[in-house]
Amino acid sequence: MKKLLTLLISAGICASVFSTISYADFPDIGPLPPVPVNPDNPPTPDRIALGKKLFFDNRISGSGALNCSSCHIPETGWTLPTKYSVANEGFVERRNSPTLLNVGYNKALIWDGRAPSMEKQAVGSTKNPVHKGQDIDKLMNILNNDAEIVKMFEAAYGSKPNTADYGNAIAVFQRHTIITGESPFDRYMKGDKKAISKAAVKGMELFKGKAGCIQCHNGPNFTDSDFHNIGLKRNPDFDKDEFQKILKFDAKRMGLKEWETINDDPGRYLKTHNMDDWKKFKTPT
C-alpha cells in the first residue's frame, strides 16, 4: 500500500509539472527557413554535382563495395529500413543511420554528436574502419587519376582532388539538395490548410500539446539538436561476440580508458567522457 501511495503521489507531481508546460515554451515546428549556408563552403551547381558524384561512388570505400548511399538510401528516406546499418567487411554496426533529410539544419551530427561539421563527417566516415575503411591518401590518388573527377574538382573548387574539398563537396550536396521543402506538412505550415487531413491536424495539436512530443522534437526540423537519455534498455544483441567487438573497438577509438569493459552503447559519453552524458543520444528529426 505504501509503495502504491508513493507511485500515485509521484504520478500526481509529474502530471502537475507537465500541465504547466505549454507548446509556446518551445520553438514552433515549421515551416522550414532557408537552409543555413556554410560561408566557407557556399553552394554552386558544380560543387553540388561533384558532391553527388562522390556520394554514390563505391571507390570511396576500401572494399569498393560501399558508398554513402549504402546507409542513406534515397528511396527509403535517406536511411536504411533495417535494424542496423551496413558495416565495412569484418565489422557489424550497432546503430541505424540517421536520415539525411534536412541534415543541413542539424546542429548535431551522428547519434553521439562526435562530428564537428558535415564536411568533417564526410571525411571521417570515409576513413572510419567500421564505415567505409578507405585510406584517404589512397582515395585521393584514385581520384587524381580519374580525368573526369579532376575536371569536376577544378570546376567546383579550382583545385585537384584533395581531402578538404572532398569533404566540402559531399557536404554541400547533402546540405543543399536533401531537403523535404514541399511536403504536405510544409505546405500546410505555409498556409495551405487543405494540404493535410483533419486527423493530421488533430495529431499535430496533440504533438504540440498534451502528448508533449514538442519538448524534444521542436523547431522547423522537429529536433532540439540536443542529447537525451530516454531510459533505453541494454540491447541483448550486445551479448554477441561481433557486437562486443564493435563496442570495444569504437570505445578505444574514441579514447575511453575503460574501453575493455564497455558492454553497452555509451551514447554521447563516447565523445565527452562525461558520465552525465551516459547513454544520451541525439534527438532525431
Specify the residue positions occupied by each region the protein language model found.
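Bacterial N-terminal signal peptides that target proteins for export
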Residues: 1-9
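Bacterial N-terminal signal peptides
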Residues: 8-16
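Periplasmic c-type cytochrome electron-transfer domains
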Residues: 5, 19-285
